[in-house]
Amino acid sequence: MINREQCGQFIDANTDNMVKDWKRLVEIETGSFDKEGLEEAADTLKAMFEGIGFRCDLIDTGAAGKTLTGILGREREGKPILFSGHYDTVFPKGTLADNPFRIENGRAYGPGVLDMKGGIIIAYYVIKALNSLGFTERPIKILFAGDEEIAHENSTTAETLVEEAKNCEFAFNMETGLPDGSLCVGRKGGITISAEVTGVEAHAGNSFETGRNAIEEMAYKICRLREITNLSEGITVSVGTIKG
């Protein structure tokens, strides 16, 4: 049984090191299309987790950032614990120059500091704390994606996550919690849908009745789609782009 007090003491004693590693990771710019930065971050994380006993693999995702998977204590008897997340950010290369990593009035700033390099560092130090206290009850697994901010387009990262999570006793996604500091125990999913509406061309003056206006039909469908939104159920539908 892990002693919570001892675990907390380990974290407190390593606060400075946590901030240093946090800073180091944030200062590697990892916009979802910055292949060079993503490669550096993936290699950095792989080395960090291998340094605390993990056996890691990097899964190529083509143009996007690689997916890092790893396991510690594969031979342990209990069902695994999984820590997951992503290391890509929404910030383009060069953002760091104007928004460097810094701590002001107890708050950290910088590209990806919250979403979600801070969460990865938390996972890393939680595992280090467990190692220091001799935790051997369960295997510990990690999965950190390099293409989350672009919804894993053209990659199998989502399928890899499902596979890695199978048979796990617990899974912790290291994204941020709620604004009041409380933990979030669920996230809603999302789906992207493309629809094409085709009209019938006709002269608006001479042959109005033979035509079918695709713009009007699309407007009608947008209104119907909006009716699906149900805020009390957490369901939202947003039409983002119209072309034609």
Question: Locations of the language-model features?
Answer:
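Acidic/His- and Gly-rich active-site-bordering loop/insert found
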Residues: I2-P111, S132-F135
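Predominant activation on well-ordered alpha-helical scaffold segments within soluble catalytic domains
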Residues: K23, K46, I121-K128, E159-V162, ...
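Buried hydrophobic positions in well-ordered alpha/beta secondary-structure cores of metabolic enzymes
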Residues: E29, F83-H86, A123, I142, ...
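Fold-independent oxyanion-binding glycine-rich loops
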Residues: G85-Y87, A145-D147, F172-G177, A195-V200, ...
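Short glycine-enriched loops at secondary-structure junctions
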Residues: Y87-V90, T95-L96, G177-L178, R187-G190, ...
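Glycine/serine-rich anion-binding loops at beta->alpha junctions
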Residues: F91, R107-I121, H203
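Acidic/histidine-rich catalytic neighborhood of metal-dependent amide-processing enzymes
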Residues: M116-K188
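Acidic-enriched catalytic cores of C-N bond-cleaving enzymes acting on peptides and small amides
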Residues: V185, S207-K243
